[in-house]
Amino acid sequence: MTTVGVSLFRRSPEKITMKIAAFLGLSFLLIASYVLICEAQHPGFQELLILEENMRDPENSKERSCAKPRENCNRMNILCCRGECVCPTFGDCFCYGD
């Protein structure tokens, strides 16, 4: 009777290895999905929205391809209407100045 109870709690090394491998595989998939979600929220999409907004803004009709103060900007693609594009250590770049 005692040997039956003890054998129920013993696990073979193959089962333990398979559980560890499954855990590591699922952890990798979870991290990969987080990376893909973050990539989907790339600032390039936000830059496109700024350009579309500026195209429809009558106040900004002379400077249609620029970002207003405190809007996000990118030194490569979108210039600021007035002021300069400031990029902090953490976070998105934004237009600063008048």
UniProtKB/Swiss-Prot annotation:
Signal peptide: 1-40
Keyword tags: Disulfide bond, Ion channel impairing toxin, Knottin, Secreted, Signal, Toxin
Gene Ontology molecular function, alphabetical: ion channel regulator activity; toxin activity
GO cellular component: extracellular region
Subcellular location: Secreted
Propeptide, residue positions: 41-64
Tissue: Expressed by the venom gland.
Family note: Belongs to the hainantoxin family. 17 subfamily.
Protein name per its UniProtKB record: Hainantoxin-XVII.2
